[in-house]
Amino acid sequence: MKIKTLEIKNWRSIKELKVMTQDLMIIIGQNNHGKSNLLSAILFFFGEIKHQDLDFFQGAEELFVDIEFSELDDQDKKTFEKYVTQQETIKVRKVAYLGGSFEYKGWIQTCLEDYLKEENAGNYTSRETASSLPFYQYLPPAGRLSKQQIIEAQQKYIQSNIRNLTFSYELEETNFMGLKSVAKGIFGEVYFLPAIKNAADDFASKDTSVFGKLLGEVVETMSQHNEDWQGTKQQLANLFSKFSKYINGVENTERPKQLSDLENELSKELLSWNAYFDIELNIPDIDSVLKSNASVWSNDGTRTDIARKGHGLQRAVTIALIQLIAKRQLQSNQDSETTNRKVSKSRYFIFEEPELYLHPQAQRSLFDSFVELSTSGNQVILCTHSSNLISIDKYKSIYIIKKENEQYGSKVTQCEEDLFDGNQKNEWNLSYWINPDRGELFFAEKVILVEGQTDKVILPALADKLGVFKHSYTVIDCGSKQNIPLYIKLMNKFKIPYVSVYDKDHQENKSEQAIGAADSATKAILDEINNELGLSVELVNDIEQELGYDCGKSGKPFQALKYIKSSEFHISESFAEKIRVIYK
């Protein structure tokens, strides 16, 4: 199963927040705006971290995290049967209280028919009463009826007639699944890679480490299928059976004399206490022995443990471990059958700034790995400061978190619907190759949308010359005038301030038809602009005319840059004012 919706209230900088999730979630935003708080709320729900009094939003005495799960497999439906809705989802809330306590509660789709309400089950334990009710066929044919049998019959009847019944959706008053505490991992495995972590911890042989989990799977497989391994375990069992004082209730005459002598000597010393000693040697768990004595070495020309390698390699190896576990689990899920297990097979991978210590090319490769991981039945959630871990064509996976003020707390902006269709989608995807670093726009204070490379080079250079350049502004080459509206759509959806810079394209040598096409392209830009977020600046008729220089057809950006750096260049006051407006 996977997270479908996430609702948070009163957690750290988050007063109230609800987001629709994706298989891949990329959380971005400025420092101290709530990215890590969003991740930590998810970790709190899964039991990976404990809440503290400082985690409560501004004086709140209660906080909660609600998660709705979808894509339940047959085993999940069986495990969480009580909570499965008509839409085959379940919703669970983890509540924490100031002072330390917490509890899980499930949302229950309650049938409005009184005879199907769980709280009324005790009224129907009389067989005479129960026999008149529609769910009677699901009860045992004879014997006394218990309240639990009535509840189970109610649930079976509801499942069989779910489309013909009316429901309300309410938070249960009792604990989730009737348990005072929910076992860690009941909703699936969580793998969390924080921003700062000692890679040696992941390669420790303990069961909770990433490597320990992977090694545990290998040892379990060997234990079940390797004949030599099974033979060794049997030999150990035979050996240790000789140390037992009794075998099947009969005294063991082959027991080593040294053990019996030690028992007798100890008993003799405590004769006045009427105390007698038995020494029992238990068979060691060879699986645990092997795991606890494992060590991992890395050889990149020099054989050392992983802690003595560079941070980049340490980070890469940890991520590789996680990816390997995901691949093995995918194969395991395909081969397994429904069982009576009480935990979900789901896996959630949570990364905090995974780009740390990795060069740009490695970051881009890592992002491809995350995409592959998210399309293999897993859910991947990460927060990042790197544009290399963002793909603009996956705009539905992008979550921009902002904290406008302390009173309202952190809020998320996301896009749930398709922005483009048909040719627009193709043009949007093609424009990636024109501007592969366009993911940077999501981190910008303001985005400057331009038609081509010459504009992208010249506008910042002129802004620098005029003393108005700002590093927090990003210039995006849209590839053509016709593509600018596509970017404006995206800016509007994510509420990113922007300015659209386009050519009027009314040159004297142009035909009426060409001018008409240019005007249509201009209108498409102006129609798309949201005046609360963006504005437009028109160049007459293009940047070359504004500069008063013909750059030629070859190497236009470089030729134009040489010109504005030369002593003969003087910018017109009208063009200078446009530059100031763009960088305002």
What are these regions (language model features)?
Residues 1-47, 258-261, 289-292, 296-437:
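Switch/communication elements of ASCE P-loop NTPase nucleotide-binding domains
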Residues 19, 56-61, 83-87, 183-186, ...:
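Conserved catalytic network of the ASCE P-loop NTPase/AAA+ motor domain
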Residues 37, 74-237, 514-533, 554:
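Glycine-rich phosphate-binding loops of NTPases
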Residues 39-89:
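Conserved P-loop NTP-binding catalytic core
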Residues 49-52, 77-79, 166-183, 280-281, ...:
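Short alpha-helical segments and helix-capping/turn motifs at coil-helix boundaries
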Residues 60-65, 87-92, 186-190, 346, ...:
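Short glycine-/polar-rich loops that comprise or flank the Walker A/P-loop
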Residues 86, 184, 434-449, 453-584:
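Acidic, Mg2+-coordinating catalytic modules of nucleic-acid enzymes
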Residues 185-187, 195-351, 510-511:
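Extended helical coiled-coil dimerization/tether regions that scaffold
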